[in-house]
UniProtKB/Swiss-Prot annotation:
Reaction(s) catalysed by this chain's protein: an aromatic L-alpha-amino acid + 2-oxoglutarate = an aromatic oxo-acid + L-glutamate
InterPro entries: Aminotrans_II_pyridoxalP_BS (IPR001917), Aminotransferase_I/II_large (IPR004839), ArAT (IPR024892), HisP_aminotrans (IPR005861), HistidinolP_aminotransfase (IPR050106), PyrdxlP-dep_Trfase (IPR015424), PyrdxlP-dep_Trfase_major (IPR015421), PyrdxlP-dep_Trfase_small (IPR015422)
CDD domains reported in the protein's UniProt record: AAT_like
Superkingdom of this protein's organism: Bacteria
Pfam families, alphabetized: Aminotran_1_2
Gene3D superfamilies the record matches: Aspartate Aminotransferase, domain 1 (3.90.1150.10), Type I PLP-dependent aspartate aminotransferase-like (Major domain) (3.40.640.10)
Function: Aminotransferase that catalyzes the conversion of aromatic amino acids and 2-oxoglutarate into corresponding aromatic oxo acids and L-glutamate.
EC code(s) of this entry: 2.6.1.57
Record note on quaternary structure: Homodimer.
One GO BP: L-histidine biosynthetic process
Cofactor(s) needed by this chain: pyridoxal 5'-phosphate
The protein, known as: Aromatic amino acid aminotransferase
Claim: Transferase is one of the keywords in the record: yes
Length: 342
């Protein structure tokens, strides 16, 4: 009755939430949705008896203006994670290969396996914790259909440069799709980092992926967007679940896009606190809303911080700590000092 290979597919594990503890394990923002988004959600709720616009025409139009693309180059989904899944399904058949950095977004190997594809993880560079772009190129075979790049990378917070990306793309076969995952784009202050809206204009095999879950504070309503070659976008739409993006999510996203100044102010606070947290915990520079502590002992560190009311994310390769606002940073620092100097 059930696919035999499902037993071997890992289950996605979300960040822990321990009661009243400070949750710094899921890269959520501390502030609520923008006021305009809250108002839009409230208004849209009165029409919740009707199906949402399956084509998200208004939202795609606003996104087109925001991104300087055409609506035909854009699709929306139930978070960028759903769009990653659609991209795998649109490009891969059983036995095809999906290359991605590792450690990176935890769901990449899951998406590949669910589609019957082979997951090909390429370890991060040990000295920088960045993408091993050369190693990813070396891993390409005649079965490779898709490569995910995560920029900034989750959980390391590292980025690659425009020059590195261009050199990479020059060697990627034209029939291999590159998904440029920019879930943390709004927190990225690296001046030499590639931007997917520009990349998709140069490369028909590049798809940009972004979300409203992080900087926009809409993780609970689930809405993201992808953009690129209309042919690829159309293929992604073919494998989408109908009516996946609710009317509330579409309304909230439109309102959020129209409040860019407020968003910038909020992300600047995160950037300021990011430097503060990195200095206290000894983390390398990050371009996302978290910092990364590579190495062993992450589970022990997470356990000790939890005893002091702070929840972080422990991976086998290291610990990730979400960065939010000044008040929560103060609380994190108190717990950190209690663990290390108490």
């Amino acid at each position: 009755m059930i696919r035999a290979d499902l037993t071997d597919i890992p289950t996605y594990v979300p960040g822990k939430n321990l009661g009243d503890a400070l949750k710094l394990s899921s890269n959520e923002v501390a502030f609520p949705p923008l006021p305009a988004a809250v108002s839009a959600i409230t208004e849209a709720a009165t029409g919740a008896n009707r199906y949402p616009d399956m084509g998200a025409v208004e939202l795609r139009g606003v996104l087109a203006d925001h991104l300087e693309l055409t609506p035909e180059q854009i699709t929306v989904g139930c978070g960028s994670s759903a769009l990653c899944q659609q991209l795998v399904q649109a490009t891969c058949a059983a036995g095809d290969e999906v290359i991605f950095p590792w450690r990176s977004f935890e769901a990449y190997p899951i998406f590949a396996r669910v589609a019957g594809a082979t997951a090909v993880p390429i370890p991060l560079l040990p000295d920088t914790q960045g993408h091993d772009l050369e190693g990813m190129l070396d891993a390409i075979t005649d079965r490779t259909r898709l490569i995910f790049l995560c920029n900034p990378n989750n959980p390391s917070g590292t980025t690659f440069t425009e020059e590195q990306f261009e050199a990479f793309m020059q060697r990627v076969p034209a029939d291999v799709v590159v998904g440029l995952d920019e879930a943390y784009f709004e927190f990225n202050r690296a001046e030499d980092s590639p931007v997917s809206t520009e990349a998709v204009q140069r490369y028909p095999n590049v798809i940009g992926l972004r979300t409203f879950s992080k900087a926009y504070g809409l993780a609970g309503v689930r809405v993201g967007y992808a953009f690129g070659n209309p042919e690829l976008i159309g293929a992604m739409n073919k494998v989408a679940i109908p009516f996946a993006v609710s009317s509330l999510a579409q309304a909230a996203a439109i309102a959020s896009l129209n409040a860019a100044d407020e968003l910038l102010e909020r992300t600047e606070e995160v950037v300021t606190e990011r430097e503060r947290v990195a200095q206290v915990v000894g983390a390398a520079p990050s371009q996302a809303n978290f910092v990364w502590l590579p190495g062993e002992g992450a589970a022990e560190l997470a356990g000790r911080l939890a005893e002091h009311g702070v929840v972080i994310r422990a991976f086998p390769e290291g610990a990730r700590i979400t960065v939010t606002n000044a008040a929560e940073t103060d609380r994190l620092i108190r717990a950190w000092e209690a663990v290390h100097h108490g």
